UniProtKB/Swiss-Prot annotation:
Family, as annotated: Belongs to the class-II aminoacyl-tRNA synthetase family.
Superkingdom, taxonomy of origin: Bacteria
Cellular localization per UniProt: Cytoplasm
PROSITE patterns referenced in this protein's UniProt entry, alphabetically: AA_TRNA_LIGASE_II_GLYAB (PS50861)
Reaction(s) the record says it catalyses: tRNA(Gly) + glycine + ATP = glycyl-tRNA(Gly) + AMP + diphosphate
Subunit record text: Tetramer of two alpha and two beta subunits.
Entry GO CC: cytosol
Classification via InterPro entries: DALR_anticod-bd, Gly-tRNA-synth_bsu, Gly-tRNA-synth_heterodimer
Name under which the protein is recorded: Glycine--tRNA ligase beta subunit
Top EC class, one word: ligase
UniProt-listed Enzyme Commission number(s): 6.1.1.14
GO BP terms in the entry: arginyl-tRNA aminoacylation; glycyl-tRNA aminoacylation
Length: 690
């Protein structure tokens, strides 16, 4: 026989951002505990609303499965004396396993005989195990910022106010944080009252009758369908925003969507000025027409039924109107001061107490950005546009609009720059230089946006590392990992052949020229090369690169990000071919032997066998062409050229012994192999491939 199990933890309102993590934890914890307790079940569901977490296990067995195990003990020679009597070791082992010494038996493992005990454990009734399982599930949940309440030491997302625990129709009796488990749940805060749950099987149905839709996926789907239906009524649609949809899903228990109107006199404002207060502050969904143009409507979702919707609609419209009135005022006031004049106001804004003002930071970014443009071989006019972009990129930080709506930084700067006639390249660069703003965000596409974005992020990373701020574990308050990943992503997409070491050094000089002291450059270079290599590895793994391919490539460093990625791409393709096997074998054999060489260059005059003389000549013959291919970054052709040496290397190993007694000849041969390693390793250290 089997019954359904339900545990509901009722709380005060929980932040929406906690919900996805708790759902995963609750599911994993319930599965783990059932497995450890040997409790079979048919299905497992987890639920969350702003006022509860719950787990429903369908078809949970009424008793544990019986358990039989064979436990290994001491070796036979230690378990029995010469007369075959059990020693203290055997007796102690038997006692620890709850069996008699006479019940021990012998089995062989890896050629050694050991004594074993066979343990049998009868399954206990499930109801006896569930009180502890329930408390373990509750205490096993973790939250970013748990809180205490009353005089309790226990911490949780928010204070727990009730606990429902049922196995079939029977209450699972236990007490936790001063609350006794029972059948009494609570419905919607204003529409529903107390709910006495009859059985776990009726949980969703009974809670819905009390205006609580406990299944978050069902709530999400309901919200999305209602939004679409309302948008269609005004000939519009809603662009899917998963983050906003998830947030709304997790702040309501009973969704009812409603359509509101935006006053026409605000529709002249830039679109982000209208949609940012909607989405970020009010959790409204903007409505667009079929071409994507913003319509004077929004959709919001009420936590309740359709009672007095007209009043709720008017209230939401009033709140948005106040927000947009503020925005319109800021927009007018900001236009009274040209963007270029705002740059000087950045002197009064501290970036970091150890790294100067934002104005100083702008100068560093400006210098670094122009340097990057020059390194990329851009003409003077383009360098000027890059420098102008960098100068104006942070000016909007002192505007009224960005002060009240920080999400609009860069967006407003681009708009204000356009108004005063800045070049399109400058306006686009200002808009794009914050990108990528989050994981999965678009990368900047304009050369001004790409260069200023890299300069901006490098300045932030070098400065932070330079004063001892580094990401640790899950802590990265300055988003340095995301910024480094942005640098890597931009360089890869743009295909820049540029030295990371040189960029770090140039950034370091900018700090020094402002009198800002950082850690020694050598220490900083080492730490940052490792840091960026980790980010490059992450990006390439996300693109499908195998870990050992990256091990091989990155063993040679990642100073030139684009080249390292190109090597990984070529190596991934070549290792799938049949000719790669003898190639890698030759490389590894040459590598292992060449490690025994003294540090002296190859002198071909010391070679005597025709095979080694021919190999040395082939190396010299290909040296110039090979160097040119490496300089150009053409690793596929460099590999093809190196492959021509494989038959000669195999002939050498078949013809001569490397480790001869003649020291001069031995060292010459080892040096020759070292030369082979340098060429064959053009794609990486192949000995690291699995």
């Amino acid at each position: 026989m089997a019954k359904d199990f339900l545990l509901e933890i009722g709380t005060e309102e929980i932040p929406a951002k906690f919900a996805p993590g708790v759902l995963n934890q609750l599911r994993e914890q319930a599965q783990k505990h059932c497995q450890e307790l040997r409790l079979d079940y048919q299905d497992l569901k987890v639920y969350t609303t702003p006022r509860r977490f719950a787990v429903l296990i369908q078809g949970l067995a009424e008793k544990q499965t019986d358990f039989t195990a064979e436990v290994k003990g001491p070796a036979v020679k230690a378990a029995y004396d010469a007369e075959g009597n059990p020693t203290k070791a055997a007796q102690g082992f038997a006692r620890g396993q709850g069996v008699e010494p006479k019940d021990l038996f012998v089995q062989e493992l890896n050629g050694v005989s050991y004594v074993y005990a066979r343990k049998f454990e009868l399954g206990q009734p499930t109801l006896q195990l569930l009180p502890k399982l329930c408390t373990d599930l509750i205490t096993g949940l973790h939250f970013p910022k748990p809180m205490r309440w009353a005089d309790l030491e226990f911490r949780f997302a928010r204070p727990i106010r009730w606990i429902v625990a049922l196995f079939g129709s029977e209450v699972i009796p236990f007490e936790f944080v001063g609350l006794a488990s029972g059948k009494a749940s609570r419905g919607h805060r204003t529409l529903g009252g107390p709910v006495t749950l009859d059985s776990p099987a009726d949980y969703e149905k009974q809670m819905l009758q009390a205006f609580v839709m406990v299944d978050p996926e069902q709530r999400r789907q309901s919200v999305w369908e209602q939004i679409h239906a309302l948008a269609a009524k005004v000939g519009g649609d809603v662009e899917k925003d998963d983050d906003l949809l998830d947030e709304v899903t997790h702040i309501i228990e009973y969704p009812t969507a409603l359509l509101g109107e935006v006053a026409p006199n605000y529709m002249h404002l830039p679109e982000p000025v209208i949609t940012t207060p909607m989405k970020e502050h009010q959790r409204y969904f903007p409505v667009r027409d079929k071409e994507g143009k913003l319509l004077p409507y929004f959709i919001t979702v009420r936590n309740g039924d359709d009672h007095a919707l007209a009043k709720v609609k008017a209230g939401n419209e009033k709140v948005l109107k106040a927000r947009l009135e503020d925005a319109a005022f800021y927009y007018r006031e900001d236009q009274k001061t040209p963007l270029a004049e705002l740059v000087e106001k950045l002197d009064k804004v501290t970036y970091h107490e150890k790294l100067g003002s934002v104005r100083q930071r702008v100068e560093r970014i400006r210098t670094l950005a122009r340097g990057i443009a020059a390194r990329l071989g851009m003409e003077s006019k383009k360098q000027d546009l890059v420098e102008r972009t960098a100068l104006l990129a942070k000016a909007d930080l002192v505007t009224l609009m960005v002060y009240d709506f920080p999400e609009l930084q860069g967006i407003m700067g681009a708009d204000y720059a356009r108004m005063v006639g800045e070049k399109p390249e400058v306006c686009t660069g200002i808009l794009e230089h914050y990108q990528p703003r989050f994981a999965g965000d678009e990368l900047p596409q304009s050369y001004t946006g790409q260069i200023v974005s890299v300069a901006d992020k490098l300045d932030a990373i070098v400065g932070a590392f330079g004063i001892g701020i580094q990401p640790t574990g899950s802590q990265d308050p300055y988003a340095l990992r995301r910024q480094a990943q942005g640098v890597v992503g931009i360089i890869l997409e743009a295909g820049w052949d540029i030295s990371l070491e040189q960029l770090i050094a140039a950034s370091y000089v900018n700090f020094a020229e402002q009198g800002i002291s950082l850690l020694p450059l050598a220490d900083l270079q080492s730490a940052l090369q490792d840091f960026f290599q980790q980010r490059l590895r992450f990006v390439l793994q996300e693109q499908g690169a195998r870990y050992d391919t990256l091990d091989a490539v990155l063993a040679q460093g990642s100073n030139q990000i684009t080249r390292a990625a190109r090597k990984a791409q070529v190596l991934a393709a070549k290792r799938e071919t049949t000719e790669f096997v003898p190639y890698s074998q030759a490389y590894i054999r040459c590598l292992n032997l060449s490690k025994k060489a003294q540090t002296q260059p190859l002198d071909p005059k010391n070679l005597i066998d025709p095979t080694e003389i021919a190999l040395a000549a082939a190396l010299v013959q290909r040296q110039e062409a090979f160097a040119a291919l490496i300089e150009k970054g053409d690793y596929a052709e460099a590999y093809a050229l190196a492959s021509e040496l494989i038959p000669m290397i195999e002939a050498l190993f078949n013809a001569v012994m490397i480790m001869v007694e003649d020291e001069i000849l031995k060292q010459a041969r080892l040096a020759l192999l070292g030369e082979c390693v340098a060429i064959l390793g053009c794609l990486g250290d192949l000995s690291l491939l699995a």
